[in-house]
Amino acid sequence: MSLVLAVYGKGGIGKSTTSANISAALALKGAKVLQIGCDPKHDSTFPITGKLQKTVIEALEEVDFHHEELTAEDVIETGFAGIDGLEAGGPPAGSGCGGYVVGESVTLLQELGLYDKYDVILFDVLGDVVCGGFSAPLNYADYAIIIATNDFDSIFAANRLCMAIQQKSVRYKVKLAGIVANRVDYTTGGGTNMLDQFAEKVGTRLLAKVPYHELIRKSRFAGKTLFAMEDTPGKDECLVPYNEIAETLMQENTPASIPEPIGDREIFEIVGGWQ
């Protein structure tokens, strides 16, 4: 039975880079991993495969949306450390529903029988809008993980994600494993002071603190995971949080909780006092 992870976060905060490095850390510890990009940008697996691969929606268009005509090879690319990548894709700009495409991708995974092939399945999901389609991975996930930075907009999005996780937990097994603090900068960004308080308030924890480092940014543009980059000063330090996350997730009983989110209006008042 696969361990299913749903990684969410506000767009533009390094969610896909973090997801790819978590997948890499898990794979290097012996897990067979499938990473599924659930964002219309369809670049989640770029650091793993080194290219923008064909999306599920593109493959479906080629067979006039007859799911039964597709095979795993039509939509999956294998990359770094044997990680398999799949991209849901999205409709043309200005038309259709990206969440619907995510739902279609989940259906395809079931039809292809892929849930039993992997040790870990990681959904990398757009977290700005948690509509029915984009929340679909929570129906299958053992654990949700939120990627966030130490600022109000990111925390507001994280709080909305906590609402979705809380709601889904009523009918499904999903729990929140924790928050990954990304781009942590103690010189200008306040470290994790706001995230620490938010995590305590909603009843979760910080899984790890990923430092703000130029090497991580460069790895993204190079189409590589951080693990695949040449050894340079700072690399070992940057790898630590990804390995910590992988070790935590591979425990037999990963600590997790059902979050208690803050009300939309209340969060403006509360977070304002954390500056």
Swiss-Prot record:
Cofactor: [4Fe-4S] cluster
Catalyzed chemical reaction(s): chlorophyllide a + oxidized 2[4Fe-4S]-[ferredoxin] + 2 ADP + 2 phosphate = protochlorophyllide a + reduced 2[4Fe-4S]-[ferredoxin] + 2 ATP + 2 H2O
Binding site for Mg(2+): 16
Entry-linked Gene3D superfamilies: P-loop containing nucleotide triphosphate hydrolases (3.40.50.300)
Molecular-function annotations in GO: 4 iron, 4 sulfur cluster binding; ATP binding; metal ion binding; oxidoreductase activity, acting on iron-sulfur proteins as donors; oxidoreductase activity, acting on the CH-CH group of donors, iron-sulfur protein as acceptor
Pathways involved: Porphyrin-containing compound metabolism; bacteriochlorophyll biosynthesis (light-independent)
Binding note for cofactor: Binds 1 [4Fe-4S] cluster per dimer.
Keyword entries, A-Z: 4Fe-4S, ATP-binding, Bacteriochlorophyll biosynthesis, Chlorophyll biosynthesis, Iron, Iron-sulfur, Magnesium, Metal-binding, Nucleotide-binding, Oxidoreductase, Photosynthesis
Domain of life: Bacteria
GO biological process, one term: light-independent bacteriochlorophyll biosynthetic process
Binding sites annotated in the UniProt record for ATP: 12-17, 41, 182-183
Residues engaged in binding [4Fe-4S] cluster: 97, 131
Enzyme Commission numbers on file: 1.3.7.7
NCBIfam families per record: DPOR_bchL
HAMAP family: ChlL_BchL
Function according to Swiss-Prot or TrEMBL: Component of the dark-operative protochlorophyllide reductase (DPOR) that uses Mg-ATP and reduced ferredoxin to reduce ring D of protochlorophyllide (Pchlide) to form chlorophyllide a (Chlide). This reaction is light-independent. The L component serves as a unique electron donor to the NB-component of the complex, and binds Mg-ATP.
Annotated family: Belongs to the NifH/BchL/ChlL family.
Assembly and oligomerization: Homodimer. Protochlorophyllide reductase is composed of three subunits; BchL, BchN and BchB.
Protein name, per record: Light-independent protochlorophyllide reductase iron-sulfur ATP-binding protein
Species name: Chlorobium phaeovibrioides (strain DSM 265 / 1930)
Name of the coding gene: bchL
